[in-house]
Amino acid sequence: LNMLEPVGETLASEYPYXK
């Protein structure tokens, strides 16, 4: 699991890094 680069849509939604 990459906290800096979430490859999962669910992860990106819960943890919008960079966005």
Curated annotation (Swiss-Prot):
Keywords from the named record: 4Fe-4S, Cytoplasm, Iron, Iron-sulfur, Metal-binding, Molybdenum, Oxidoreductase
EC code: 1.97.1.1
Cofactor note: Binds 1 [4Fe-4S] cluster.
Cofactor(s) the protein requires to work: [4Fe-4S] cluster; Mo-bis(molybdopterin guanine dinucleotide)
Catalytic activity: chlorate + AH2 = chlorite + A + H2O
Intracellular or extracellular location(s): Cytoplasm
Recorded effect of pH on activity: Optimum pH is 7.5.
Entry superkingdom: Bacteria
Protein name: Chlorate reductase subunit alpha
Species assigned in the record: Stutzerimonas chloritidismutans
